[in-house]
């Protein structure tokens, strides 16, 4: 691009030296140069976006050939168009920074005009939706259920508290689920006991008026609609109950894991407060006061490899002061945990949310649409 500006400067200087003459050809060249400078500016912006994608750990989930190059679709839902020449031809010096784009089964290889090569991984994203239409697991039984579990909605208990699936007369429930044939993620209730042990339960419950939410509506959220309270208007989602700190009697942090014991990157999922937790943070309850300016409440996600070693930890703020309490499905990036066999999700709160026996705020959050890289 430097030579464009050099030529432009020389051309303009020649005008001052030669005086009056027919300059239409010169201005035509200048207009062409402006177009080339603009094109190179767009290339610089595209290159910056590619570097940013690599730095943020994004991977390509799909490609689409366009008239002038490629459209790349990334794992976070964003896309980027790369022009590598006119009408599909390879880019030439002065035409594009991008000389060629090569696609393999696992990568997209971009060659720049100076010979440098950018290689971006390409993966398949599989999503755990909890929707009946996406079921791939085979039928199975759990002790508290008088019918076979054939679809996700069969795992939704009624009533929400004290029901047969999650409590089974307050004895062993064996409540568990496995997204077999898809993401291979699995979870359930810790030690197979009642839901107060902590764990992950499927739900579709919705409360428009969260002000009456309590432990009896522990599986409800107040985002979406009664027809679709899940992320993006879907019906079903999952609710975690439980946490561990130095005051609680529990020792196992709720988690999900890959049932086939293969390490994978969990790219992201969507989370929100349950109605019960949201009501407590907004209005307080018999155990906890409403959130103040300095109140915080967060999910702490920790990844583990197959040998049980920690890979990394990341956090999501469910409450960051009284004016920032989450009540919409919000993306939680988990890709920074790297390849994991298991992820634990602990709930941690500020001092005003805790008492002599641990958290006073209801230890729940809801999640949906867990995206896994394959």
Please annotate each region the language model reported:
Residues 1-4:
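Positively charged n-region of N-terminal signal peptides that target proteins for export
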Residues 15-19:
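C-terminal motif of bacterial Sec signal peptides marking the signal peptidase cleavage site
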Residues 21-124:
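Collagen/collagen-like triple-helix sequence repeat recognition
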Residues 124-252, 261:
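N-terminal targeting leaders for non-cytosolic proteins
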Residues 261-268, 339-340:
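Extended extracellular/luminal ectodomain segments enriched in beta-structured repeat modules
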Residues 280-299:
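Short coil-to-beta strand junction motifs in C2/discoidin
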Residues 295-374:
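Terminal, low-complexity interaction segments
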């Amino acid at each position: 691009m430097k030579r464009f500006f050099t030529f432009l400067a020389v051309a303009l200087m020649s005008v001052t030296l030669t005086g009056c003459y027919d300059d239409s050809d010169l201005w035509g060249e200048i207009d062409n140069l402006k177009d080339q400078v603009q094109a190179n500016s767009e290339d610089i912006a595209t290159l910056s976006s590619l570097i940013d994608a690599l730095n943020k750990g994004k991977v390509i989930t799909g490609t689409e050939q366009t008239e002038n190059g490629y459209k790349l679709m990334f794992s976070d839902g964003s896309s980027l168009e790369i022009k590598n020449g006119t009408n599909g031809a390879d880019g030439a010096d002065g035409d594009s920074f991008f000389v060629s784009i090569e696609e393999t089964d696992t990568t997209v290889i971009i060659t720049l005009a100076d010979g440098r090569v950018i290689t971006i991984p390409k993966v398949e994203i599989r999503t755990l939706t909890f929707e009946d239409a996406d079921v791939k697991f085979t039928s199975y039984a759990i002790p508290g259920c008088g019918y076979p579990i054939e679809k996700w909605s069969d795992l939704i208990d009624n009533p929400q508290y004290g029901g047969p699936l999650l409590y089974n007369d307050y004895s062993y429930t064996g409540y568990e689920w496995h997204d077999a044939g898809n993401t291979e993620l699995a979870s359930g209730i810790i030690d197979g006991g009642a839901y107060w042990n902590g764990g992950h339960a499927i739900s579709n419950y919705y409360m428009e008026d969260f002000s009456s939410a309590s432990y009896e509506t522990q599986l409800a959220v107040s985002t979406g609609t009664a027809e679709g309270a899940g992320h993006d208007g879907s019906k079903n989602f999952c609710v975690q109950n439980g946490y561990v700190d130095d005051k609680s009697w529990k020792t196992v942090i709720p988690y999900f894991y890959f049932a086939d014991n293969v390490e994978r990157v969990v790219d992201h999922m969507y989370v929100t407060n349950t109605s019960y937790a949201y009501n407590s943070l907004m209005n307080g309850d018999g155990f906890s006061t409403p959130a103040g300016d300095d109140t915080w409440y967060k999910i702490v996600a920790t990844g583990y490899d197959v040998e049980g070693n920690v890979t990394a930890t990341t956090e999501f703020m469910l409450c960051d002061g009284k004016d920032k309490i989450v009540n919409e499905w919000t993306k939680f990036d988990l890709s920074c945990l790297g390849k994991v066999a298991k992820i634990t999700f602990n709930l941690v709160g500020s001092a005003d949310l805790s008492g002599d026996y641990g958290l006073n705020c209801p230890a729940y959050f809801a999640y949906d649409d867990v995206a896994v890289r394959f």
